[in-house]
């Protein structure tokens, strides 16, 4: 059994660690609140832009654009959003497992995959995974802007336009609530078909200068907005997962200290009992 001094030292070490995890929990909770506000702000814009593009596309069915064309799938591309830091539970690993299963299904059909990564964890994973990383960006921080993602997004859009990839997907963790974050794979290109309620829309619109020019400008903005939405969703998910992980670590540290304190008390009691026994034995001998 460890000595009382060793046990006390270990309790002190765990207590210091508990202070750190508790502070990290509070910081994550504060950051999560701000990230939730960004999610709530960006969701309506992304949803409305998708609706507008669907309506404009229906206004001119003769308009052709590479982003709207279905073609034989030989290569697929993924824009994968991850965190830059760890200590957020299984957030990244669950996301990577989901996209790995998706890639496996494509490979069984003879389709190869290429990647762009937003976040250092994704870059590291896919370099080890063996995939070709066309673009990567890390250090988006707690307040990402759409300017931060334009570079990697443009690389993947150019690859799609040039026929290097035939489908483009976005992978991120969707923020549901504090306790739940869903790994999500969304198709970006070709542009998914409009939803039924959009197709059933009966209003006619006049577009200036014309639907073609509007759609041309909106398509790139649409992809950028969807990727940015994924970034803010993932940021909120990261802080929620980190808050939960740090709370669990803080609670576990408390339980471990209680166990060690009990061991220390037993060891101290045994030492005192031994000393009393030795004193009594010495008195009897005298």
UniProtKB/Swiss-Prot annotation:
**Superkingdom per UniProt:** Bacteria
Topology of this chain in the membrane: Peripheral membrane protein
GO BP of this protein: proton motive force-driven plasma membrane ATP synthesis
User: HAMAP family, from UniProt?
Assistant: ATP_synth_gamma_bact
Family, per the entry?
A: Belongs to the ATPase gamma chain family.
Q: Share what the entry says about its subunit structure, partners included.
A: F-type ATPases have 2 components, CF(1) - the catalytic core - and CF(0) - the membrane proton channel. CF(1) has five subunits: alpha(3), beta(3), gamma(1), delta(1), epsilon(1). CF(0) has three main subunits: a, b and c.
What's the protein name? ATP synthase gamma chain
UniProt source species: Pseudoalteromonas translucida (strain TAC 125)
């Amino acid at each position: 059994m460890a000595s009382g001094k060793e046990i006390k030292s270990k309790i002190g070490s765990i207590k210091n660690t508990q202070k750190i995890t508790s502070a990290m929990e509070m910081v994550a909770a504060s950051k999560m609140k701000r990230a939730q506000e960004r999610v709530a702000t960006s969701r309506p814009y992304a949803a409305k832009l998708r609706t507008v593009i669907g309506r404009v596309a229906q206004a001119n069915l003769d308009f052709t654009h590479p982003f709207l064309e279905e073609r034989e799938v030989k290569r697929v591309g993924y824009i994968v959003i991850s965190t830059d830091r760890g200590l957020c539970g299984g957030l990244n690993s669950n996301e990577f497992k989901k996209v790995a299963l998706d890639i496996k299904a494509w490979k069984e059909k003879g389709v190869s995959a290429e990647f762009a990564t937003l976040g250092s964890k994704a870059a590291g994973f896919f370099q080890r995974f063996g995939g070709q990383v066309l673009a990567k960006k890390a250090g988006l921080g707690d307040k990402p802007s759409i300017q931060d993602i334009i570079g990697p997004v443009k690389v993947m859009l150019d690859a799609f336009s040039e026929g290097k990839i035939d489908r483009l997907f976005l992978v991120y963790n969707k923020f549901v609530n504090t306790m739940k974050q869903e790994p999500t794979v969304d198709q970006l290109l070709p542009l998914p078909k409009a939803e039924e309620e959009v197709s059933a829309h009966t209003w006619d619109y006049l577009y200036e200068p014309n639907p073609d020019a509007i759609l041309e400008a909106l398509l790139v903005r649409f992809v950028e907005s969807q990727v940015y939405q994924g970034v803010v969703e993932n940021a909120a998910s990261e802080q929620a997962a980190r808050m939960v992980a740090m709370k669990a670590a803080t609670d576990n540290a408390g339980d471990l200290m209680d166990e060690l304190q009990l061991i220390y008390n037993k060891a101290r009691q045994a030492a005192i009992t031994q000393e009393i026994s030795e004193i009594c034995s010495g008195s009897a001998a005298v």
